[in-house]
């Protein structure tokens, strides 16, 4: 089964959210998540077919999940997030103990969620999504909003990206942002299908949103 074009489009647009600065926006006021990129589809090879939908990650135990976390991360006090790209899951650690574990959708091949150590720099409730091509604003309640009800930004890069995404060739000129967010496509959670962002079930991203603060450390394991 090939990856649906609509799904890929949504994952690209999620992966190209631009955020200006560290901030937290709550209450009932929608927050527009701005886009700062130009997306172009170069001439494609008509003979190349869409890639199959990536499979769900194999389940692992709590012990196996913690075994992948570096010792210095385990030794840190306080709350922190650890994204395990290999097993498509998000771990919540507090004072070195794993308190929660969630399935997650991560970046697809060639568009992997950036590995490294970062910090949460923006939290948005009910984000308003800006279409990167038309400029249309899509409210959080709309079925056309791929961000879900929460946005937690932790990575920003302005070098641009390009390549095959499983469905088409894309060139992204400008800044891209990766973060945790909800998704209307529940079946994608647990798969490597995005362009870098991390999708969680709505009920899970709301829990994570309430747990973290601006500055919370995020470690992404390859």
Descriptions of predicted regions:
Residues 2-222:
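N-terminal pre-domains immediately preceding structured catalytic cores
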């Amino acid at each position: 089964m090939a990856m649906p074009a609509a799904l890929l489009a949504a994952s690209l647009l999620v992966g190209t959210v631009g955020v200006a600065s560290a901030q937290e926006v709550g209450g009932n006021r929608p927050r527009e998540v701005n886009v700062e990129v130009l997306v172009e589809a170069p001439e494609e090879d008509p003979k190349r077919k869409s890639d199959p939908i990536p499979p769900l990650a194999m389940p692992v135990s709590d012990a196996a999940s913690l075994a992948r976390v570096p010792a210095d991360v385990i030794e840190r006090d306080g709350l922190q997030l650890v994204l395990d790209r290999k097993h498509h899951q998000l771990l919540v650690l507090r004072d070195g103990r794993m308190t929660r574990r969630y399935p997650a959708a991560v970046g697809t091949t060639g568009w992997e969620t950036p590995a490294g150590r970062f910090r949460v720099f923006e939290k948005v409730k009910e984000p308003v999504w800006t279409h990167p091509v038309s400029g249309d604003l899509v409210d959080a309640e709309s079925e056309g909003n791929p961000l879900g009800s929460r946005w937690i930004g932790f990575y920003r890069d302005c070098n641009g990206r390009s390549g095959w995404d499983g469905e088409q060739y894309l060139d992204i000129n400008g800044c891209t942002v990766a973060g945790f967010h909800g998704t209307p496509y529940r079946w994608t959670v647990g798969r490597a299908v995005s362009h870098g962002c991390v999708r969680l079930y709505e009920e899970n991203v709301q829990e994570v949103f309430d747990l973290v603060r601006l500055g919370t450390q995020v470690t992404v394991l390859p």
